[in-house]
Amino acid sequence: MGIHGLTKLIADQAPGAIKEQDIKNYFGRKIAIDASMCLYQFLIAVRQDGNVLQNEDGETTSHLMGMFYRTIRMLEHGIKPVYVFDGKPPQLKSAELEKRGEKRAEAEKMLAQAQELGEQENIDKFSKRLVKVTKQHNDECKKLLTLMGVPYIEAPCEAEATCAALVKAGKVFATATEDMDGLTFGTNVLLRHLTASEAKKLPIQELHYSRILQDIGLTNEQFIDLCIPLGCDYCGTIKGIGPKRAIDLIKQHGSIEEILENIDSSKHPAPEDWLYKEARGLFLKAEVVDCSTVDLKWSEPDEEGLIQFMCNEKQFSEDRMRNGCKKILKSRQGSTQGRLDSFFSITGSLSSKRKEPELKGSAKKKQKTGATPGKFKKGK
């Protein structure tokens, strides 16, 4: 889910913290990618006649096709992706997961009704609401990445938290995800739309956390205390407090405790036994991979292994797989050239003194939405 309304709030309050970029500008960059978010995108978007792609055995293959071709696209642009997979969800997320289960049950009812009435538009809509990333999807994509020579990490808990830790440790340049809570976990740079379909022609949004804090005038702790009332995955919100009021209150009072002391609780009641302190603690000290043990390596693809898995087992076209391998090998030759700025320390911040380019497209529009050891795998 991420943080409700945070994208629009940042676009309104700190537009200078958002840059729109082309994928070619990330040549030579190592980027940590929220794998679950990608798989969800692929299962929603990679479809034929409104249905997920399947092989002759009835096995879903949308996630594999999406992972294969989108990863190759990044490699061809000189990007070095590392995928981060979710581990066990935190206990605080159980209420949110329960809500999602209820929504799925409702979507199943609506889908059955739409199928009975032959309403194709609603069939497509409710089918997408039932999309769920499974352990099998994850395991198959991990196998595919290993065969492609692309590293992945199994986070001990939330993938976005481990992505942020990798950025803060200097292992990668940015976190790529659509969930804005990557910022709440403290990633210095967050990229949106990096793994979106090329057909959508969405510019990549690059958000700089230090500039957001600077322009809004908040500390890291205050930003977290802003995000919790906006709505996150770990606890409820204060009734009747929207994004504009939330930012005014946090600027005025500095913390959730002080806000609760100073608002009219009869008009704006907080949830009973509100777990905001626990949510704050999770954002501040998330369970993440031990970054000192992470050694990222990108290697040559195992072409015959790919053919065995993707063609013999999953029934993909052998010509397309071999052509994909050629593209990976060619990209490895091109990516040996480094970035000039790799010789210098990169802080990931934007200077507020220089004039920012005028935003266009989605960033300009008012949007409606807004260390414990882990398991590390690399391409063999």
Swiss-Prot record:
Family matches, as Gene3D superfamilies:
5' to 3' exonuclease, C-terminal subdomain (1.10.150.20), 5'-nuclease (3.40.50.1010)
Q: Where is this region: I-domain?
A: 122-253
The record's comment on cofactor binding reads:
Binds 2 magnesium ions per subunit. They probably participate in the reaction catalyzed by the enzyme. May bind an additional third magnesium ion after substrate binding.
Return the annotated region ranges for Disordered: 351-380
Record text on subunit structure and interactions? Interacts with PCNA. Three molecules of fen1 bind to one PCNA trimer with each molecule binding to one PCNA monomer. PCNA stimulates the nuclease activity without altering cleavage specificity.
Family membership: Belongs to the XPG/RAD2 endonuclease family. FEN1 subfamily.
UniProt protein name: Flap endonuclease 1
Question: What is the species listed in this Swiss-Prot or TrEMBL entry?
Answer: Anoplopoma fimbria
